[in-house]
Amino acid sequence: MTRRVHVIKDPEVAKLLADETRRQILNKLRHDEHSTTDLAKALNRNHSSIVHHLNQLLDAGLIEVTREEKVRNMVQPYYRSVSSSFHVAYSLTEALSQDPDYSAWQEEYIDNMLLALNGYGISVPEERRGEAKTLLQTCYLGQKKAYEERITKRISVPEVSKYAARNTANVLSHIQLMKDKEYMDALHRLSEIIEEPEEDQQG
């Protein structure tokens, strides 16, 4: 049985997640075991490329071999991730900001958060998009830190539904975040941007 959350504390391991193909492989292996051939077909990648990425993930301890099967006189291993969820430690934030690939990935993530606001009918004015991105990043990192602290303090997994457990965890995170002045300041400033009357946004 895989662990529910795997906290990555090694910056070199965290950098592996900056590659989209490796993220896609991990996502596949979180749900079920797959062979190299399975992954190559599913991701439309050549076999040697998948082998390369699998070896990196295997060496990093993010995946494991679950079984081996003999196919045409060859041994074909099957892989699965060691966890259903991966979390890059908040303590690595500063170190990883110096890595161009990881920084680009995180930049894209924040861009997507900004874009996701459109789904709620929220359009951030062009002149305030830079500010909104900075505030979103502060909120994201604050939530990331609170989540990490929360899961490290959990001493057992209660026998309740996953939805009840998740909502309880969210309440605890909100209580913790209320004590984070930087997070709360960013949240209030962000709310001022996204709650501006439409006529004000249009100038």
Q: Which residues are covered by each model-predicted region?
A:
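Conserved segment of winged-helix/HTH DNA-binding domains
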Residues: 9-13, 70-111
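Short helix-coil-helix linker/hinge
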Residues: 15-22
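Short beta-strand "wing" residues that participate in macromolecule-binding interfaces
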Residues: 65
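Charged, low-complexity intrinsically disordered regulatory/assembly segments
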Residues: 115-203
